[in-house]
Regions:
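A short beta-strand motif characteristic of beta-propeller blades
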Residues: 1, 35-41, 76-85, 126-138, ...
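Beta-rich, blade/repeat-based domains predominating
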Residues: 1-20, 24-26, 41-59, 64-66, ...
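Structural signal for beta-propeller blades
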Residues: 24-27, 65-67, 111-114, 163-164, ...
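Short loop/turn segments that connect beta-strands within beta-propeller blades
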Residues: 30-35, 71-75, 117-122, 167-171, ...
Length: 225
């Protein structure tokens, strides 16, 4: 039993990497076959995470206005920290583009989703506000939360007005209303052909078949015999 899990992503080693928030404040990895959990990082305040195909872990620390990075075999480092006038004020959801060259982060307390280019060593640069989210009214934040991308690079961001969709250039493609009066907070593609989009709202999970296909989870690296 592992309480306060908020973000989950398969790593190249086949384990599920997760944020464990609250008083735990750590990043953990679950080996489902062995039934074991390893603590990857402690004394952090994680919200959501992604893992690249070569083992870099990126996670949002909302309270710190920070994107953090754990390189393979390394320790936690601040990849980017926003100021009160620039960057995501409450970084929340996080996703990779299909080529894993760009990292995107939603801002629960603002109107934008921000992007960074990922360098060869895993560092982040060229931060920019790439997507403008719709809000319930001009004076309210978007409450941008969980997010994902599909196989052609479209962005899907949960928000106060529903699931917002954007093309790879950041242009609005449409909004799917929330299936319940509870806010939707997480989104991912799964199922046959990764053509079903799933959202979490409160204690319920909903799915909808789409014409798009999500990005397949990282495949475990094969071991040489």
């Amino acid at each position: 039993d592992a309480p306060r899990i908020s973000g989950m992503h398969f790593g190249p080693d086949g384990r599920i990497y997760s944020c464990q928030g609250g008083s735990f404040g750590r990043i953990v990895a679950f080996d489902l076959k062995a039934g074991e959990m390893e603590v990857i990082a402690e004394n952090v305040r994680p919200n959501d995470l992604v893992v690249t195909s070569d083992g870099h872990v990126y996670f949002t620390e909302t309270a710190k206005m920070q994107i953090s990075h754990i390189p393979p075999g390394g320790s936690v480092q601040a990849a980017d920290v926003a100021s009160k006038t620039d960057g995501p004020q409450r970084p929340n959801g996080i996703a990779l583009t299909p080529d894993q060259g760009t990292l995107a982060v939603s801002d629960y307390g603002g109107r934008h989703t921000w992007v960074w280019r990922i360098g060869k060593n895993g560092g982040l640069d060229l931060r920019q506000s790439y997507i403008t989210l719709r809000t319930p009214s001009p004076d309210l934040p978007s409450k941008g939360d969980g997010m994902t991308t599909d196989g052609v690079g479209r962005y899907y961001v949960t928000s106060a007005v529903g699931l917002q969709m954007f093309d790879p250039t950041g242009r609005m493609g449409g909004v799917i209303a929330a299936p319940t009066n509870k806010p939707i907070v997480s989104v991912t593609f799964a199922g046959p052909g990764h053509q079903y989009i799933y959202v979490a709202a409160g204690d319920e999970i909903f799915r909808r078949r789409t014409k798009a296909s999500g990005v397949e989870a990282v495949r475990p690296q094969s071991k040489s015999k």
